[in-house]
Amino acid sequence: MNTLLSIGRSIITSAPRIVSARQTTVTARTMATVSTINMPRDPNTLSNYNNWRTKHTIADLAIDFTKQRVHGTVTLQLESITDKESEEIILDTSFVDVQSVAVDGNKTGEWTLEKRIEPFGTPLSVKIPGGAAKGTVIALAITLSTTDKCTALQWLTPAQTSNKKFPYMFSQCQAIHNRSIFPCQDTPDVKSTYDFRIRSPLPVLASGLPRGAGSFVHGENGESGTLLYSFYQEIPMPSYLFALASGDIATASIGPRSLVSTGPEELIGAKWELERDTEKFIETIEKIVYPYEWTQYNVLVLPPSFPYGGMENPVFTFATPTIISGDRENVDVVAHELAHSWSGNLVSNASWEHFWLNEGWTVYLERRIIAAVHGEAYRDFSSIIGWKALEDSVKLYGEDHEFTKLIVDLKGKDPDDAFSSVPYEKGFHFLYYLERLVGKPSWDKFIPHYFTTWKKKSLDSYDFKATLLDFFASDSAASKALESVDWDSWFYKPGLPSKPEFDTSLVDKCYALAKKWESKDYTPSPSDIEGWAANQVVVFLQQVQLFTTPLTPVQSQAMGKAYNLVNTKNVELSSRYFGVGLAAKDETVYQPTAELLGKVGRMKFVRTLYRKLVVVDRKLAVETFEKNKDFYHPICRDQVEKDLKE
């Protein structure tokens, strides 16, 4: 391993700002007392995780829907990885009410919450007098409560749920929000096993395998009684994969090792949507990488305010309800989140500066699943849609922007601000380029090697490079081909990479129909898109959005009526059509856009539509946001606030 690391770093000589941070030692810091620490390679944590590593986490927590708080005790078992060099453990926290800290059962130890450092939070310093010998494990038991400033949890009132009967709570910890639930080493460079013991009046799901529920306690003052729900996770996972949800949740089988959970009224529809493809997807990716290691693969379909398409929490993928469209056209989200079970969950990026290692690999594997199930042309079809998303992100940021690089500089920055399609699609294109360079048969041998080498570990881009070059060192043809890779350009050059030649067989008719719409006189008919898959309509709408001259309002209205795009349940279609209508300044789509923004919390749709709506009707955009801001998840709300600033 050391050999690989030195190879990986010595090759990249033209990027002197990147150093092997794991080998850098400093002897002072500004936050608290002087202490010897090894500088970590993740700039978005305040923890001294290169001196101490969390090995196991026990979360004994209660969910209080009345006060909208999670409270209890979290015990971190931390191993000293130096020999008495560090006399304190520093943990990440953000807006957590820390009430006590016990060190190996001793509550008389010294601990301090330091000054808050934006955007990362408040470091919690726990004194360990004399330090600890290398390999010693120290248990920190931290009693705490979340606060109303917690950025990881969203609380829904009964009125915000579909059946209006019970409250609901769910977490979203990626990228650096676990620290707002409990103090931790909030970095993907640290992995821990977990025990969850969660008390709630409503059913609970977590990112672990269920042990069952019991230990009923009667409620007081007319409140509901509670059960203790237990889960365990024996595969070490990073802090951002800690996940909880509690509410009126019903469950059904969608395969031999898979369940779907959602609201009781939505269960039948969700089961139908997912049961055909889930096991097929699992069996397909197992042939590409290796067998699934997390025992169960389940899907929790969340209320509509969930900010992402899906979140790859182990055992239970958290998914947006927008995938339940009644036509099985959006189940590729499941393929994506399933692929994360290998890329991201088993093998993790060491910091959010190397996020492409999670998402680029996942998009790559997702498209390999699609190709195996539907045919190779579908991989290129998906890639064409992805290329448009990449172009949109680069256009939004500007082609010279830091956040359009594969490796981004996040020092002092909130990783959420860098979230876009760039790590997904630019990362995919880098891997797709390497596949074509060495040849698919050779590349397919590298895939399981890579995921075996880094299983249960974290890596950065230089580790990836070293692993790749080492694997192909004995293959003279592949090694020769890899000599042509301009690593510096791929890693550090902003903007778009070279566009590959795609198989356009599935999109040619989409392009042809879009071409017809360039004429102001074109009269549409429902037969134009008869027999089309939803994603083909997506490609058509994307092409129309590229027009130099937008449609007229009359054209926009004719399109919506002929192709039934206003009332479709498929948000992938309605959101893009509204984008076309807003560009056309078609006032008949303004109110439907505002209504959709009150029903969907997925940032992919919400942020895009607000950016377009604010251009044509700032007043309506601001009013819509003010009306719905409590509906949105805190992560989404914060990003839209930034989007709407003048």
From Swiss-Prot:
Cofactor(s) essential for the protein: Zn(2+)
InterPro entries per record: Aminopeptidase_N-like_N, Aminopeptidase_N-like_N_sf, ARM-type_fold, LTA4H, LTA4H_cat, M1_LTA-4_hydro/amino_C_sf, M1_LTA4H, Peptidase_M1
UniProt cross-references to Gene3D superfamilies, sorted A to Z: 3.30.2010.30, Neutral Protease Domain 2, Peptidase M1, leukotriene A4 hydrolase/aminopeptidase C-terminal domain, tricorn interacting facor f3 domain
- Pfam families associated with the record: Leuk-A4-hydro_C, Peptidase_M1, Peptidase_M1_N
List locations, semicolon-separated: Cytoplasm; Nucleus
Q: Which domain of life is it from?
A: Eukaryota
Report whether Translocase shows up as a keyword of the record: no
Catalytic residues (UniProt) = E337 (proton acceptor), Y424 (proton donor)
The family classification in the record reads: Belongs to the peptidase M1 family.
What protein name applies here?
Leukotriene A-4 hydrolase homolog
**Organism field:** Botryotinia fuckeliana (strain B05.10)
